[in-house]
């Protein structure tokens, strides 16, 4: 069936003894041996035994080339789409000069040899949303963000910046704290440019807060729905841990600022909760 398809197919294997990378296409794989080459290409040594073909032992092609963009270019591709699953092996620089998109996940996809069906289904859903995001069909960084409703994200971003500025006026170190939270959790800066998902920076604090309280990631959200789900996921108001920094009451500014510095993501989660509490209730209808 693969040989009869109009879609070209290729794979990479690695000679075990020499660690030489071998690029293979259907044209140079002998008839009847495709399954052998596929098994060799996926023999992830040392977890899986090397696979022998014609007296030569081979291991997973990813050891020397885990994203074979060059092979796709040689086979006639005019545009490349690579998938980075953060696996073992060597990722070679892309020297093809072709338009290229790399799809990768914000989330930990689990151990390499975890074959749990529930996790697999979740990872498939995450991969779909990562792809949709890369092609500009969804926004966000970690979550799949659907088109906005009633300018909720714009209003959230404006209120968040206002509350952040107010907190910084009480403790100037919070400017760095907020930036570190984004950096630690791999979220973009507030006004970073991104052509495929231009709203990523604005909604990043809400996504970060949602991640911190384990909002499910395998379904898409509108900004409003993500906010509502975040609030529903909180047993207690995260903002209660920083009442002084957030201007809710008088207290120990230095102590709360030190706590925020120690756990930047926790402070941003509190700030998001505080921000949402300041938004008009009509925005959540």
Segment roles from a protein language model:
Residues 1-285:
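Patatin-like phospholipase
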């Amino acid at each position: 069936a693969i040989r009869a398809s109009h879609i070209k197919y290729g794979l990479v294997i690695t000679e075990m003894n020499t660690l030489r990378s071998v690029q293979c296409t259907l044209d140079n794989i002998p008839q009847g041996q495709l399954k052998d080459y596929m098994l060799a290409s996926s023999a992830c040594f040392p977890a899986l035994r090397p696979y022998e073909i014609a007296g030569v032992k081979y291991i997973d092609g990813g050891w020397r080339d885990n994203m074979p963009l060059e092979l796709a270019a040689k086979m006639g591709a005019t545009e490349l789409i690579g998938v980075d699953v953060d696996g073992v092996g060597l990722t070679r620089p892309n020297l093809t000069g072709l338009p290229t998109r790399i799809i990768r996940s914000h989330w930990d996809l689990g151990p390499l040899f975890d074959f749990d069906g529930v996790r697999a289904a979740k990872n498939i859903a995450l991969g779909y949303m990562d792809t949709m995001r890369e092609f500009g069909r969804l926004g966000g960084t970690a979550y799949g963000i659907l088109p906005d409703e009633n300018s909720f994200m714009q209003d959230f971003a404006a209120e968040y910046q206002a509350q952040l500025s107010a907190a910084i006026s009480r403790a100037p170190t919070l400017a760095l704290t907020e930036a570190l939270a984004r950096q630690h959790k791999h979220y973009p800066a507030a006004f970073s440019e991104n052509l495929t998902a231009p709203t990523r920076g604005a909604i990043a604090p809400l996504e970060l807060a949602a991640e911190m309280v384990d909002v499910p990631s395998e379904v898409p959200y509108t900004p409003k729905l993500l906010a509502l789900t975040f609030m529903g996921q909180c047993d207690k108001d995260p903002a209660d841990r920083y009442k002084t920094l957030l201007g809710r009451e008088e207290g120990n500014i230095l102590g709360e600022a030190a706590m925020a510095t120690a756990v930047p993501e926790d402070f941003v989660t509190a700030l998001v909760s505080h921000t949402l509490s300041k938004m008009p209730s009509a925005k959540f209808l």
